[in-house]
From Swiss-Prot:
Protein's recorded name: DNA-binding protein Fis
Pfam families: HTH_8
PANTHER family: DNA-BINDING PROTEIN FIS
Organism superkingdom: Bacteria
Matching InterPro entries: Fis_DNA-bd, Homeodomain-like_sf, HTH_Fis, Trans_regulatory_Fis
Lineage: Bacteria, Pseudomonadati, Pseudomonadota, Gammaproteobacteria, Alteromonadales
Keyword DNA-binding belongs to the record: yes
DNA-binding region as annotated in the record: 77-96
Amino acid sequence: MFDQTTNTETHQLTVGKIETANGTIKPQLLRDAVKRAVTNFFAQMDGQEAEEVYEMVLSEVEAPLLDIIMQHTRGNQTRAANMLGINRGTLRKKLKKYGMN
């Protein structure tokens, strides 16, 4: 469940970059963090075969993303959907999928 506390730093998502009160954060930072996490995951697999990695990675990234966006918007689904670039119905389905409704 998402916490409706206020976020002290104002974020504005834009195509290709994230604008914050402190300047621009390049999406490459996020990509690098995901790459490190997936690399570490496979290192821990110790040669074992992994299955459904795509779905696992998406759900492990999507759930905290939704939680953080919902916190930032104080539970406002319309604002959250706009920030994510998806429609509100899709957001509702995703929130339900992760038990955040």
